[in-house]
Amino acid sequence: MPLRLPDGLPAIDILKRENINIEDMLTKEDDKRPLRIVILNLMPFKATTETDFIRILSNSPLLLDINFMKLKSHASKHTPAEHMDRFYHTLEELSKEKIDGMIVTGAPVEGIPFEEVDYWTELQEIFNWARENVRSTLYICWAAQAGLYHFYDIPKYPLPKKMFGIFPTIPLKPEQPLFRGFDDVFRMPQSRHTEVRREDIEQVDDLEVIAESEESGVSIVRSRSRREFFITGHLEYAPDTLDTEYRRDLGKRDDVEVPKYYYREDNPDKGPLVTWRSHANLLFMNWISWVLGGE
């Protein structure tokens, strides 16, 4: 199904090299109103994250209008200002038209207390606005922790070592529309140094843990009263993301552990074995269908 993307977005050419011909999906005019999705991209390397999400959203059976949001209170250090000016808009600009769904990405700030993040106040304002004006929001990784803390005072805790790998995860509520078509076990990429804990979530009546891993802990939390989901991992990750991260860290220190359940035979030289892609696509497609249907 066609997508609407900003003209000239680098992700279009990147995905073409992966034999995903986004150009064939692009459209400017259509009789139907597209489902408008806004991605608040908090990651430092914007183009990589843009590509990850467009790759997975390109499987949508519905017409999507993809937009990217930027913060006013924080300037990206790793993405050119020209890119931000051309492809990103503020909340004030984007909120002039109806937004159906919103995705808030992770951010490399989990070692900092929430209140000390330089854009925390603006982020809180965006969270509050989304809750009142967007049909459904997905909070990813650090954003999931930030959303749970902002709305429900759920703390984050440092882990003794990095949670790093592709972890078997159980859908505890298979009847949830988000899990339609899921197997009894799916795998979720994790890359984090902190966690939220079930015992804190269980103290909040409005929250429910709907997916969990024996090894990596709480995986997906939902709001019972709103269409908000807090996902602690990165189902959107490309096949080589953890490999890139592993080799980057290996160049900095010697005590880096190999990501679990990721490489063939646990051998980095043999490359990653992709085990999460189909369920990742299914989860995002279920979310899009639910956003539109408003069940």
Description of each model-found segment:
Residues V104-K173:
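Cysteine-nucleophile active-site neighborhood
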Residues G101:
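Short, Asp-centered acidic motifs that coordinate Mg2+ and/or phosphate
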Residues K72-D85:
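N-terminal beta-loop-helix "entrance" segment that forms/cooperates
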